[in-house]
Amino acid sequence: VFQQGPPDSSGWRFSDSLDTYGFISAAPGQRVHVSSASEDRTYSAVVGADGTLSELAIFAERGGESVAVDASGNVYVANGQIFVYNAGGKQIGEIDVPERPIDILFGGPDRRTLFILGHHALFAVEVRGKDKL
């Protein structure tokens, strides 16, 4: 897991133990979720003041291409389809999409629109909220 920035910035490796890709945004002290497709696991960690990850723990026994967290704290993992977990790591649902997702993120004015990037299309799904799809 790497930190990157503008061309005049320097990047550094967050973790030597994670094999993951996809974009996440986080500030120091914030909890993040990263997915390892090769291990088929999703991890939770806290971003330190220097950008390193600490308190690394398995969040879900499913990895994937991308992870996104909604405004209610539910965690979405893209792995062939979208698997949805509550903040405690319990799977609460699935979202089927017409093609394999390669990246997901939340947007919209209330952060309740899940944007799903496939190989040939961009999809948008409205989510309801805490522990609901």
List the predicted regions and their residue ranges:
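Surface-exposed loop/turn elements that mediate protein-protein interactions on large endomembrane-trafficking
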Residues: 2-9, 94
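Short loop/turn segments immediately following beta-strands, especially the blade-tip
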Residues: 5, 44-52, 126-133
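Structural signal for beta-propeller blades
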Residues: 1-2, 40-43, 82-83, 122-124
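Short, acidic, Ser/Thr-enriched surface-loop or helix-capping motifs
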Residues: 48, 70, 86
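Beta-rich, blade/repeat-based domains predominating
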Residues: 1, 11-32, 57-74, 78-79, ...
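Short, solvent-exposed loop/turn segments at conserved positions within beta-propeller repeat blades
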Residues: 35-40, 77
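Short loop/turn segments immediately following the C-termini of beta-strands
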Residues: 37, 47, 80, 109, ...
